[in-house]
Amino acid sequence: GNQIAMVFQDPMMTLNPVLRIDTQMIEAIRAHESLNRNEARQRARDALGQVGIPSPDERLKAYPHQFSGGMRQRVSIAIALLNKPDLIIADEPTTALDVTIQAQILHEVQKLCQETGTALIWITHDLSVIAGLADDVAVMYAGRIVEYGEVDNVLDRPMHPYTFGLIGSVPSRNRRGAPLHQIPGMTPSLLNLPRGCAFRTRCPQAVDLCGTAPEVSEPRGSGRLIRCHSPMSPAGLTTELPGISAS
């Protein structure tokens, strides 16, 4: 759309398998703008070039099954960029791409957001992507946001025990050979969440009060929102964490 665009993890949720790529891209453009077919085709060609698809003129004539999984994902990202939307929601869109193309697409998305003022919600498990891409980060556990703040504050000085464990489980070149932190237990079923805080059965900071659902609070001087009865102190934690930093 021209207001909100979605990039799915599986590109086949975006692409119609029986239509050529140019048909799908031109249709997406002309549904929102009064462009002739040649103008729309040129914009579609430029979008494919933006996401690193070689020979875009020829690839426009192809069908989705003629692309690899990574190439199909690039096409779906190009479709999302076509109409310069106000908001892009991206659900792990670079999972199937190699590191070089991933970096290129992240650069193009950043450039688009800076030039047009487009807001971006990037859903991912890759903290290195978040560190390099995001201004703010929301950490979710069992379907709820447990910590939210500026990306450098949260990744460098986590306060929620789950955030701390999540960052500690990422390999770091600064701690080569050292054992990774492990969060004990298993993620609970959303159909049978424990009473109170959903993380309390796995949490090293758990107290009796965690049996009641925590409210969102903003600890003084922390620069973030947190949903926790027993948060960790942010002071001095950076030396224990892997080398992930937004700075």
Question: Where does each model-flagged region fall?
Answer:
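Short catalytic/signature loops enriched in Gly
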Residues: 54-60, 148-247
